[in-house]
């Protein structure tokens, strides 16, 4: 255990540790055990902990009403005929399939029937609900987990914060963090990562500063998260100072992961010469991840020569990282990335659809293309010109800038516009890093359509609103 975040509570005797062992023996016992333990805590002057436990007991007593209220907001649709066959195995099967919607419905049904879901299953469901479209379901799972664990269960609350981070709900995550009676270094990293992934880099640095001011000693994991934060904010100076302080002030020897993070921080901000010099001065042989990162970011910033040089090193260290397209293009890819996927037919705005402009199999191809042409015309009027330096190899062989538009995520944007409610936000998910040209284009599209556009790439969320991205053009 570490000192509590509020800076007031500490561990008195072994009784608080005893309280964390069993929810039934401490908080929910029908006998005199709780009163006995409370008497001991009062004897040693722990009035704050006594109040915390009393508050928790009141929460447990009102759990049924609270949870039913939350679940009631999430409409369940288990039909009577299906309900007869619903078991815990049904819940497990849905979780394995990744079907979080029906899993939450089954969870509600089972708990109404008196079945107490165990913590392991709830944490597994929490991982499935860590996505923007599952926010309401995530809140239901949150209530179920909190009702099951003690106030001092740090791991469960870390998982809840991680879940809300994936849901793009920083407010919910921060509320959980601030209400935690105690935490550990993993909690700090999870909360900082939540800030960073959702575009709040400055808040993450403020949290780290607050951590040190409380007299805590950061470890290597926390420093690595600090470097990731500085990558987002573009604060190379702060990141460099923290890298030096890591060894000089705290005696932490940098690992390969730390060198990789600092390389990415320098290269992301366009300091390619400094990044190359940093890599060449490493006291160990740079890993393939380091060279691959420098390769990708060199091409992002237009230094094709350095990118090609790094690509040669990547190929020597791990030839599987590259193929014919990635060795001549922007980022390393896998063969599975080019497998044609079935067009999405979901009605909600949270989806990512990929298909070529020549793909006539999509049922709405005509109206999508008409909308695409209209948006393209408005983009031209606003001065948008496709930046061909980001597209080489097969795309450049077309010798037509107009076709570049349809070879990226923009068709998915158009499909989302057509299928979502007016003025509602659009969320796009992808497993590759967004390129500068697409980033500029989506800022303009947020102005044209009047929509907030959230794009989750391989690392962070980009929120495009009124022509501005929350990442401040640093990612």
Curated annotation (Swiss-Prot):
It is found in: Mitochondrion. The keyword Repeat applies. Residues 381-475 are annotated as: Type DYW motif. Its main location: mitochondrion. PPR repeats lie at residues 83-117, 118-148, 153-183, 184-218, 219-254, 255-285. It holds the Pfam family DYW_deaminase. One of its GO terms (cellular component) is mitochondrion. Residues 1-37 form a transit peptide. InterPro entries: DYW_dom (IPR032867), Pentatricopeptide_rpt (IPR002885), PPR_At4g14850-like_plant (IPR046960), TPR-like_helical_dom_sf (IPR011990). Residues 350-380 are annotated as: Type E(+) motif. GO terms for molecular function: RNA binding; zinc ion binding. It comes from the Eukaryota. Keywords: Mitochondrion, Repeat, Transit peptide. Gene3D superfamilies: Tetratricopeptide repeat domain. Disulfide bonds: none annotated. GO terms for biological process: RNA modification. Belongs to the PPR family. PCMP-H subfamily. This is Pentatricopeptide repeat-containing protein At1g29710, mitochondrial. It comes from Arabidopsis thaliana. The gene is PCMP-H67.
